[in-house]
Design a protein with these regions (language model features):
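Membrane-embedded transmembrane alpha-helical bundles that form the catalytic cores
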Residues: 1-186
Length: 186
């Protein structure tokens, strides 16, 4: 769904109307507007290709958990605090950059291998389509994890915190075109 399409105009009017309608509804600290915006953002992202929703969910879950585990290491303190935080930062970086690198560069490396060694590795070509916005949300989720690792912020907690973090990652107006937000904007 392109921003200048009729489909987006209809989508935007519906989302704006629902956002306004849910303005006053709040329960247990959960804002209905945030839930609606998250659902709309996932719909928007899934509209391109529903299979890519799993990628954004994986990035969101990995970084949410990594942030919580790093905070546990920070709160435990001690001289080995950094040693206990580092595996969670590495897990976040490997997962996020691994997904980004796979989708962005896999076919390039297969083609380079074919050209360099004169072999036919056509069976390895996956004809992958680059998921829309993967660079933006990858670096955005990583900024969250890095800020927690550097102790510049504390992670969000609980399921309401998770929903807020998921919305921070997937918010549809900035998901496919940026800008990449700092985690402190959460």
């Amino acid at each position: 769904m392109w921003f200048n399409s009729f489909d987006f105009a209809v989508f935007f009017v519906i989302v704006l109307g629902l956002y306004w309608a849910f303005q006053r509804w709040r329960r247990h600290g959960l804002r209905a507007q945030n839930v609606m915006l998250l659902a709309a953002s996932y719909f928007f992202y899934g509209y391109w290709d529903w299979r890519f929703l799993s990628l954004i969910l994986i990035s969101t879950l990995v970084d949410f958990v990594a942030g919580l585990r790093m905070q546990e290491a920070i709160e435990a303190g001690g001289p080995d605090k950094d040693r206990r935080k580092r595996p969670w930062l590495v897990a976040s970086m490997v997962t996020n950059l691994g997904l980004l690198g796979f989708f962005k560069y896999f076919n390039f490396f297969v083609g380079s291998f074919e050209a360099a060694f004169g072999v036919d590795a056509h069976a390895l070509h996956l004809d992958l389509v680059l998921p829309v916005g993967i660079s933006f949300y990858t670096f955005q989720t990583m900024s969250y994890t890095i800020d927690i690792y550097r102790e510049r912020m504390r992670p969000v907690r609980g399921w309401i915190g998770f929903l807020d973090f998921a919305l921070f990652v997937a918010f549809f107006p900035q998901l496919v075109a940026g800008p990449i937000e700092r985690a402190s904007a959460l």
